[in-house]
Amino acid sequence: MELLEQRILRDGRLLPGGILKVDSFLNHQMDPQLLQAMAREIKRLFADVRVDRVLTIEASGIAIAILAGLEFGCPVVFAKKSKTKNLADTLYTAEVPSFTHGNTNTVVVSKEYLHTGENVLLVDDFLATGAALVGLRALVEQAGGTVVGAGIAVEKVFQGGGDKLRAEGLRIESLARIASMDEKGIRFC
């Protein structure tokens, strides 16, 4: 998606350790018009499948997931990174290592919000190693649902997660695919 790529080149910043900082428009301060355009593109890319529910992970994927849910006309659920007191004891759980934060989270979704037979679209802001998508897919599988694909804002292709998951049969549509990034700049696929 050229609009997103241009915004990354203009406002994104590279940090040590392979981190792309896009918090001025995507995952801290957000540009609603850009997010809406991204959600519309995800809808276009997945127009051939029925989507009953959108699932993302707390917190940075929530904004784009909500807008995607509006486009598909379906509910949006986000996996929480910790169990809170107001969650029931009937939970689906999965372990998800975080590349950005360098830790592992046990993500949870109440069994009230994922159901057998549902077609679920995974949505997230970044795809690097693929750990978040693996965890989200596990939650859907525990519920007896079907993952129809994953809509991703930014894929770091050089980290291999997308290729691995595609080889396992997961349909992934990424709006911006980064082939490499270093002190010389960001190069898209």
Spans of features found by a protein language model:
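PRPP-associated nucleotide enzymes
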Residues: M1-V123, L127-C189
